[in-house]
Amino acid sequence: MQHFKVVDNQAYIGGTHNTRPVMMAFSFFDHTTKVLPGLYANHIEISSIEVDPARREVHVLVHTQKRGCQFSVRSYSYDAKPLRTLDFGGEDHNLISGKLLTVNDDELMLIGNYSTDCTPYSQGIYVTRIAHGETGPADADRIQYVEFSALQNFFKYLKPKQQQKMQAKLDKLKQENRDTKFRYRLLVHDPILTEEGLLLVAEVYYPQYRGTAMPNAVNLPRVGPAAVDRYFDTFRYTHAIVCGFDRQGNLLWDNCLPIQDLDSAELTEMVQVSQQDDKLVMAYPHKGEIKTEVIQKNRTVRETETFSLKVGTNDKQKITDSENENLLAWYGHYFLACGFQKIVDDPRQGFNPREVFYVNKLTYSLTEKPTDDKAGRSGK
């Protein structure tokens, strides 16, 4: 299961079966299940599902890897009947992912990342407005594209000298009228409605693979000096970008959160954002700690800070390992942190760690300087 949404008494569940996408509607009332038609096919990926409680509609955003890498918004009724399809296709830009956000009674905004070569590697982000009930081929002229190189703070995750070299490279390419496109994998979050328009957060990542050199064995063919078996290891996150748009889809500002040595076995949203007045608190879990940074549009108000997750009520207890760490921006200035920890009650009495599952309620208030005392405590 990869997608889950609820409207009234019905849940919409999306996943894959035999490498093909499947979307089902499950009724909590009579416990019946219906399959949404038109999705179980080869070369189709479900980008996201969005629900419209007011109209009792479900929008399934899909990406087709063939036929010009078409992207479409397929709308269904509450009882899983197809209503309409809005297609996005183009020779120069291929939409990879998309998120919908209702801006008023008549319009939605579609935002996500795009590529220029029909691959998972994106060259930037896009935003467009669509009308409720719009169908058929979408108007490509309404889509606004923003290349990564056009973002002022996209490369802020690099060290100062590396940033200078990157900027010099960009300036040289522009002077020579050469291509300034960059290719990154992007995990796009749900957009957030603001007074100005909308807020988009996305995390830049890449998959890591490990290679195992297998020595020659008896009766096995020799291919080169050794056979190498590459297998997936983890996803490595490098930085997160945050962009502010007005209600017409124009980029107003951008910022960047550097991410330090963060790996995850599953591709999930690690960076969480809490809105506090006109500032944003950006945070992510990292090896039993929480790292934060506070921004105000394109300015950094507080540099990276690190807070420890305390263990129980015994100060002698020590965390020896943390796994499956998750952080959630809850409400107001509160976060929730959970995961598994291995702790030692008193290292002086021997090393005998025990594993606990913890749920912490964390507070980050901009009205005062945060301290480690605000970190929550682990629950058993």
Give the location of each predicted region.
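Short, conserved, GDST-rich strand-edge loop motifs in beta-rich repeat architectures
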Residues: 63, 111-125, 203-236, 342-353
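Loop/turn-rich, solvent-exposed surfaces of beta-rich toroidal or solenoidal domains
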Residues: 188-209, 213, 218-227, 231-239, ...
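Long, internal scaffold/assembly segments composed of regular secondary structure
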Residues: 53-56, 68-196
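Blade-level signature of beta-propeller repeat domains, shared across WD40, Kelch, NHL, RCC1
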Residues: 328-377
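Entry beta-strands of beta-propeller and related beta-repeat scaffolds
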Residues: 9-13, 55-60, 106-110, 196-200, ...
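Structural signature of eukaryotic scaffold interfaces centered on beta-propeller domains
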Residues: 1-8, 48-54, 99-105, 182-196, ...
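Beta-propeller blade signature
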Residues: 23-30, 70-81, 122-135, 223-249, ...
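Conserved blade-ending motifs and adjacent loop-strand segments that build the rim/top face
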Residues: 86-98, 142-161, 174-182, 255-272, ...
